[in-house]
């Protein structure tokens, strides 16, 4: 599947470490006045400090369908964060 790149996204303040060993990131990104979109980054826990700064980020990701408790949504599967 294609990998997308977006510059200038900011975490909405939702970012947290998840997983048994807290090595994954769950975040909600916004860009400008756009609606927030959920994201998950497996193995990217070490990059959490970048999200807490509130500065614009560059992200690489794929799109995926997320099904949780009967609800279906689109989320970003993060490949990298800078």
How should each PLM-predicted stretch be described?
Residues 1-82:
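Acidic, two-metal ion nucleic-acid-processing modules in DNA metabolism proteins
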